């Protein structure tokens, strides 16, 4: 592995970690609301959170580009802030966050739906408030599924390519990730480097999932423990 590829790998780990950390807690809250509450427009919200999964990554990238570009629909006009982040590491984080969020939300929602709501009702009758019930009962019971959501979100962020190259480019040492480094190596005919990077991606992803499996088998209370 040359220096540029090593830098791309380290940047990928950094950007994927930051993106996952940013969307994980909001994703859990959205997943819990979708799993536990009924409200007008719930189907619409659920479909909207899954939209990046079915859209072509380049389409998602174009939508983000329109929000972030100086001649597009400015983020300043929508959010009241100037989002001048194109072709920067921040754009990579945005791309990774947008594409990993749907997996986090869907997996966490399944985990919350797997927790029997009667346990939460019992906790409320014992005097626990909604927040305390969520923290002391719901989260531990759903922990295995939530850990799976975290790992899936992280690995999806690591593998992000289409949205990243659209809004962040493929700048070595700045916005080039592992996926774009593989693409660059293929484009110049450096098959050995490309194949090696593919193996690195496989090994990294496998180790991440294996770690999640090992952690999920330790110290996680099951439903039967209540």
Regions inferred by a protein language model and the residue ranges of each:
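The alpha-helix within a helix-turn-helix
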Residues: 123
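Glycine-rich helix-loop "coupling/hinge" segments at transmembrane-helix boundaries
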Residues: 65-66, 163-189
